[in-house]
Amino acid sequence: MAKAPVKAGKKKSFKKKEKRVVHTGVVHIQATFNNTIVTISDQEGNTISWSSAGSLGFRGSRKGTPFAAQQAAMTAANKANETGLRVVEVRVSGPGSGRESAVRALSTAGIEVRAIKDVTPIPHNGCRPPKKRRV
């Protein structure tokens, strides 16, 4: 059997990620019944940092708790603090239990919250909702 030819000398060159300094941004909190996702972006919508209850190791029904949402918000805020983020506008979406605790965690992480806006999509009688649970 013939051996495969060995490629000589070409290494992949990766472009180094430049650190942007952002002072104001937008925090998107998506709070569902099963999980809470916190994304911090600049004014144009480019993501600076993100975190979720599931990515922090919470599993199953623990992902939907207010404590998990608080931890997710703290983690995302600490990552964003490294880029110099100080002032944010918060946009909360969804019916989950982690809405208030995530917003509170942002202010304790040293980020000034300028405005809180609810952007939960409400249908004008669109799709049929899922059937009611029988427990």
Curated annotation (Swiss-Prot):
Xref: PROSITE patterns: RIBOSOMAL_S11
Gene Ontology molecular-function annotations: rRNA binding; structural constituent of ribosome
Keyword match Endoplasmic reticulum: no
GO cellular component, one term: ribonucleoprotein complex
One family name in Pfam for this protein: Ribosomal_S11
Taxonomic superkingdom: Bacteria
Keywords from the named record: Ribonucleoprotein, Ribosomal protein, RNA-binding, rRNA-binding
Keyword field contains Ribonucleoprotein: yes
GO BP annotation list: translation
Family: Belongs to the universal ribosomal protein uS11 family.
Subunit structure, as described in the record: Part of the 30S ribosomal subunit. Interacts with proteins S7 and S18. Binds to IF-3.
NCBIfam families: PRK05309.1, uS11_bact
UniProt-listed PANTHER family: 40S RIBOSOMAL PROTEIN S14/30S RIBOSOMAL PROTEIN S11
Described function: Located on the platform of the 30S subunit, it bridges several disparate RNA helices of the 16S rRNA. Forms part of the Shine-Dalgarno cleft in the 70S ribosome.
Name of this chain's protein: Small ribosomal subunit protein uS11
Source organism per UniProt: Solibacter usitatus (strain Ellin6076)
Gene: rpsK
